[in-house]
Amino acid sequence: MSRIVSLSSPDGLTVTLRLPAADGSIAMPEVISFGPSEASDAPIIERASRINGMDEAVASAVLLPTGGMGFFGWPAICGHRSGRDFVLGFCNWTAEESEGRLALAATDTVARMSLRLTLSAHKGGVVSSQVCLTNDGDAPYQLDRCMAGSFPTLAEDATVESFTGMWGREFQTRREKLGTGIWLQENRRGRTSHDRFPMLFVESANQRFGVALGFSGNHQIVIDRCDDGRRLVHMGELFEPGEMLLDPGESYLSPLAYAGADSAAFHSFVRQELITWPGDVMTPRPVTLNTWEGNYFDHKVASLKDQASKAAELGIERFVLDDGWFARRDDDTTSLGDWDIDTTKYPDGLAPLVDHVTSLGMEFGLWFEPEMVNPTSRLFETHPEWVLQVEGRPLRLSRHQLVLDLTRSEVADYLFAKIDSLLSSHDISCIKWDMNRDLTHVGGRDGKAATARQMRALYGLMDRIRRAHPKVEIESCASGGGRVDYGVLKYTHRVWTSDCTDALERLEIQHGASKFFPPELLGAHVSASPNHQTGRQLSLSFRSLVAMAYHFGVELNPLNMTLPEQDELAQFIALHKRLRKLLHAPGTQFRLDPVDGRYVWGAASAERIAVIVAQGSQMVGEQPAPLRLPTHITQFGGRWRIADRTPQQPDFIRISEGQSDLLAGKIDFSLVSLTSAGLPLPMLRPESALLIELEPTTGDPDHG
């Protein structure tokens, strides 16, 4: 007899499975239902065999299908032992059920492989899948593919929403209708990438869910259509040729693959479980000044101290010293890997600057790029063998950099010692951990592909630093948003969303990124105008409001601002501090899909609703549609009014008398009506933004 097992996440997804009979039958666990908890009551009836198919019934929607079970779709696990044992068929399934966890195990006695699949329920309504595959034979097994998880869709027309882009234009939303074949995404860049993020949503008439891979290296996502019209979403690590060879008794442990119902579920999971804060509590996210665009490599201690003093006057709370502080680092061609303080720029070391910053009540942060080395460096001159390379092949430079082989213990020890020394001798609160190139020719000392080992070694180094300095936060940066995922976020506390600080470009970047990442983790800075990446000239108001809801910061030299600009920026910093508790509170955020270039996002509580409206480079048309808010925002009910607006004189194209009264708070309205009728706001000029704050007009707690 087959056995029914299930796993439920609180207020989230439920997975109900049929385990194959424990009689030696070769099969994989069949998915009876996957979705909201009520789906677990689905009728559980064995299906007949296919027409003109195998005599035995072979389920279509199973976890991790393999060819050995008579499955003709895309196999989730495959490999061989010197050309033999190429068919995998698991049997004798067992299940261990505990609160929030379902561990399934099976063996293949012919291929001499064993499989353990662990499904876990996480806070926020997210479930995860992880696979452990072990070679029980007496000869090596070449593992070509092993997905971390498989998640089924309904048998109906579906659309996939994925995220593509490039450097400076990350998280561009892409929607495609799924056809009858395979939808495939592969990333071979050795880091998460700017163009193929390991996360997506699948949506049909009666189902929507998202998946995310907790891994920062090469990955593969496949959506395969089954014989019965359903689809399987597979995701896992992508191996280089010959990379994953399992010796006898050796196991492969996959990354975690996550599934959740919506953005709110993923946000809740990240906040409650994935990210770990110093002291186990997130403090208000400090307004940050990062020195890169204000100084580049031109470090002068006196000027940096003056910038810090001005930053403190403006209300900034964290001062991060970016690239250029270490010896001979006058441009990006030299000295990566050395990590010795430049005694020419800093004759007394970093301590005077660090002490000055902290004396002003600000935190001090420091930039590193630990994984990289310049050929022009003392480290490379001493240890050229320490870089990833393929014997007989030329070293491939990118941004004048080579990649250190972190799988060598001596390399990891060297980097830890350098970082540990600086953190131990200075009052440093955070690290900006950069990584500015893709990986090519990723060969280890044994001559074999080492991409998978390199990523795990990186996690090990980050974990080692976290354990040695538990009060220090880490920001993940990789040429901007090139390493933003649920793997690196286990060891970090913030991500640099993009190297592009142009507020107009940031609208779509932040819109896409915020679907999987809470806003307080996404670095968003006010930069100079004209912008250094695009040359666009944008108002300080627009730049500030676009960054307002995220981990707010500044990317410029404040000494170069006029006094009126400094005053205006200080007002926006004060506004962010007043609203950040609301903007970053769990379960309060919302975002609307952009229409005619108009982006809308914000946060809500029973006492206050903050709505940011930003108009892109195009005009809406004759007039904008009324602003409708989602039901989880209007659920507070009662009558509300606009209590405040920023700026006080918004850049409208035209405005009616009634709209003026509305913005002045003279008109109240039913909050519930905003779900259907909407709020008739005036038309903003292109490249301008408005923040409105709503408050209830009644004293009743339910605002009724």
Segments and roles (model prediction):
Residues 280-417, 430:
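Aromatic-lined carbohydrate-binding/catalytic grooves of carbohydrate-active enzymes
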Residues 127-135, 474, 608-616:
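Short, well-ordered beta-strand segments enriched in hydrophobic/aromatic residues
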Residues 3-6, 13-21, 25-224, 240, ...:
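Polysaccharide-binding surfaces and accessory modules of carbohydrate-active proteins
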Residues 194, 199-200, 205, 593-635:
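Carbohydrate-binding surface patches
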Residues 244-262, 686-694:
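Short Pro-Gly-centered flexible turn/kink motifs
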Residues 347-349, 381-541, 551-556, 560:
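Active-site neighborhood of glycoside hydrolase catalytic domains
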Residues 57-90, 198, 203-219, 260-279, ...:
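Glycine-rich, aromatic-flanked loop segments that form ligand/cofactor-binding clefts
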Residues 618-704:
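C-terminal beta-sandwich/jelly-roll accessory domains of carbohydrate-active enzymes
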